[in-house]
Swiss-Prot record:
InterPro entries: Helicase_ATP-bd, Helicase_C-like, P-loop_NTPase, SNF2-like_sf, SNF2_N. It holds the Pfam family Helicase_C. PANTHER family: DNA ANNEALING HELICASE AND ENDONUCLEASE ZRANB3 FAMILY MEMBER, SWI_SNF-RELATED MATRIX-ASSOCIATED ACTIN-DEPENDENT REGULATOR OF CHROMATIN SUBFAMILY A-LIKE PROTEIN 1. GO terms for molecular function: ATP binding; hydrolase activity; RNA helicase activity. Induction: Expressed in the late phase of the viral replicative cycle. It comes from African swine fever virus (isolate Pig/Kenya/KEN-50/1950) (ASFV). This is Termination factor NPH-I homolog.
Length: 706
């Protein structure tokens, strides 16, 4: 069986196929079959096995032949996208060369996930690490954030021809492409290489597609289809598919037709949601700046406004280059607001930096007097909330030196101890540095050594640690293992983990009870990414039901009211930068969320999962879309809604096959005929244009039934 995605019959064909795969999955779950397929059925969740089978089945066609070249794996964060991609890499490695592209900090995540998968596949093995080495030799790793990514790809396989390309955190690639001013960037070079590659299979892994702008869909689906499926220019894309008046999708039906067959979505199913901890409603703490803090904030805003006016002419012309966002969109991530946003977190005149002194050193020397409700009301408010947490706590800030490091210094002053992984130990050790009775103690093999457990837990010190982009992957893994230790269920080992954007990516954490986001961002998907570090499938299984909850907090700095009303009317900024970022984020989130809903409706599992609004057409075998998107918009929609009804009809046999018919004077030549379609396991109407139609009429009129 094979099916082509640009066909009205594809949606019903894929639904029927997945139903068959699911029945096979249930059988293999209970069997003692030792084949590789059976082992994967027992190792994978059902939603993973559906995609594993559809993608690896040489007869079906997902990602091969006349079909597209791969899938956007849009699975809710924490549902095992890495395990799914590694399963396909193992199964297809004899045909395609697996190349895994991810930020450098996440490479070890793949190794850990691969070891986990090997243990699931081969529970009888006594040495999974040996099998890990054997399988790992088939894979090539490339750093998405490396300056020489192109050279790494050449070294990994010479080219992308004949490879299985797996891109983790793929939304970063999509953003990188549309933020590129030219073809010289890593992201744009990778896009061009993928578009030119032959015999390539692709898996884009992300839990947050369309997080910055719907235009991210363009490079994504052009690469998956291997052709210009969506318009390259921002203005053309928005004219075709975005209603700017209502801030919602336009021509959604035509866009769905083009996307079907390239998306896998998992995340809304009730049975899956039961496996996640409960995310409690977001608590937004609007923290009024102190008079001194607000004074510094206003000075910073004056400087930022002056810089903005000085460069105002630089972005007036709309950037119409292919695969580029207009210049006005690039402003959101600019440096214009960095000063004021950092002051919104911490403002102390005690933070003075000499020419020969690094900022981090200056932060480390801050005295207790520097941390008051005058200098850091946000941090003071956050710590009050943290003290109410019954378990581990995650803190996020975009800013490292004047965000996370300032918080870390405040925690030290408050009596918390910084837990630091040691860099000099042999690979495989879980080592920490802790302070007890005035001495520094090196603790090795934490995960295995019982006396070490006693030593750590008896110290009765509340610990915190940091993961930023500068930390080594081995140290990062060590911290994650310590956090996820059964001994850390209530934060006994690590109570607080501070993470940056880069540091947070790929973390898989258990037991977390609170998430604190220190400043809003105009991209709400980033906040979702942070929360998803501890809101994951099975992350709270070890906790009793009443403790399987996560409370998120967001901190927004607002104006000092007394000073605000003392400013002459007309000179006031009605909203702080924090407030503007938050509101902008909600506005953008509305549009991006609407496009993500379209992706869910076009997902190959949509109808199988019983979701509403799925793209389901009458299987007429007509083309689902015209290759030219502008002409496609002018043509009638070939996808006529599929309506399943029961009709009363007569049975006849013709040339050994059974057909049904109705006498209907208002249709065709007075008859409606139906034939059985084994792919969708239902009867479909035979069109009058089909030569079989006339033969069946003659057959009926002749009065024969054989």
């Amino acid at each position: 069986m094979s099916c082509v995605h640009n066909n009205t019959s594809f949606p019903v064909q894929i639904e029927a196929y997945l139903k068959e795969v699911f029945e096979k999955y249930k059988e293999l779950q209970e069997s003692k079959d030792t084949s590789l397929t059976a082992r994967f059925a027992r190792a994978l969740k059902y939603y993973q096995f559906l995609i594993y089978t559809a993608f690896s089945d040489p007869k079906f066609g997902i990602g091969q032949g006349e079909n597209t070249r791969g899938l956007l794996i849009y699975h809710q964060m924490g549902m095992g996208k890495t395990i799914l991609s590694l399963s396909l890499a193992i199964s297809l490695s004899h045909i395609y060369n697996p190349i895994l592209i991810a930020p450098k900090s996440l490479h070890s995540n793949f190794q850990q996930s691969l070891l986990k998968l090997i243990k699931l596949l081969y529970p009888e093995t006594t040495d999974p690490s040996k099998e890990l080495q054997k399988i790992s030799r088939r894979f090539r790793f490339v750093s998405l954030d490396a300056y020489n990514m192109g050279q790494q790809i050449i070294k990994a396989g010479g080219s992308l021809n004949g490879c299985l390309l797996i891109v983790d955190e793929a939304h970063n690639l999509f953003r990188g492409i549309i933020n590129s001013a030219n073809d010289k960037t890593n992201a744009r070079q990778l896009y061009n290489n993928i578009m030119q590659a032959k015999n390539i299979r692709i898996l884009f892994l992300t839990g947050t597609p369309c997080s910055k702008d719907p235009f991210e869909m363009v490079p994504c689906f052009n690469m998956l289809s291997g052709r210009i499926l969506l318009p390259l220019h921002y203005e053309r894309f928005y004219t075709a598919y975005v209603n700017k008046t209502t801030n919602s999708p336009l021509n959604a039906d035509k866009l769905l037709n083009r996307l079907v067959g390239m998306i896998s979505y998992a995340g809304n199913q009730n049975e899956l949601n039961k496996l996640f901890p409960t995310e409690l409603p977001l608590i937004i703490e609007k923290v009024e700046m102190s008079p001194e803090q607000y004074r510094q904030y206003l000075l910073a805003r004056d400087v930022e406004n002056a810089e903005k006016h000085a460069s105002s002419g630089m972005h007036e012309k709309i950037n119409t280059a292919a695969l580029c966002l207009p210049g006005s969109e690039q402003e959101s991530g600019s440096s214009y607001y960095v000063r004021s946003r950092m002051i919104s977190i911490f403002a102390s005149e005690m933070l003075t930096i000499k020419e020969d002194e690094k900022l981090s050193e200056a932060v480390q020397q801050l005295p207790k007097e520097a941390f008051t409700e005058t200098s850091s009301p946000k941090i003071v408010c956050m710590l009050k909330n943290i003290k109410t947490s019954p378990g581990p706590v995650l803190i996020y800030s975009q800013f490292v030196e004047l965000g996370l490091h300032v918080v870390a210094r405040f925690l030290e002053i408050e009596g918390y101890q910084c837990l630091q992984p040691l860099k000099v130990l042999e690979e495989g050790h879980n080592a920490i540095l802790l302070h007890k009775d005035g001495k520094d103690l090196m603790v090795k093999n934490f995960a295995e050594d019982e006396p070490t457990h006693t030593l750590v837990l008896s110290s009765k010190i509340t610990r915190f640690t940091l993961i930023t982009g500068k930390i080594l992957s081995k140290e990062r893994d060590m911290i994650q293992q310590l956090w996820n230790s059964p001994l850390n269920i209530h934060g006994e080992v690590i109570k607080i983990l501070l993470v940056s954007k880069t540091g947070a990516e790929g973390l898989d954490l258990k037991y977390g009870r609170q998430v604190h986001i220190l400043e809003p961002y105009w991209d709400k998907a980033r906040e979702d990414q942070v929360k998803a570090r501890i809101i994951r499938i099975g992350s709270h299984d070890a906790l009793p039901p009443e403790e399987k909850t996560v409370q998120p907090f967001l901190y927004i700095a607002v104006a000092n009211q007394k000073m605000f009303y003392s400013i002459p009317e007309g000179s006031q900024e009605q909203k702080t930068i924090d407030e503007r970022f938050h509101e902008r984020g909600l506005e953008k989130s509305h549009l991006n969320s609407a496009f993500r809903d379209l992706l869910k409706r076009a997902a190959i599992e949509c109808a199988f999962n019983g979701e509403s609004g799925c793209l389901m057409c009458q299987p007429t075998n007509a083309l689902l879309f015209h290759e030219n998107f502008e002409r496609d918009l002018r043509l009638p929609n070939p996808c006529q809604p599929l309506v399943k009804t029961e009709v009363k009809a007569y049975s006849i046999s013709y040339e050994g096959k059974q057909f049904f018919y109705q006498k209907n004077k208002g249709v065709g030549l007075g008859y409606t005929f139906y034939e059985y379609n084994p792919i969708i396991k239902a009867y479909i109407e035979i069109k009058p244009s089909n030569p079989l139609y006339i033969k069946l009429i003659k057959h009926v009129q002749a009065g024969t039934t054989v």
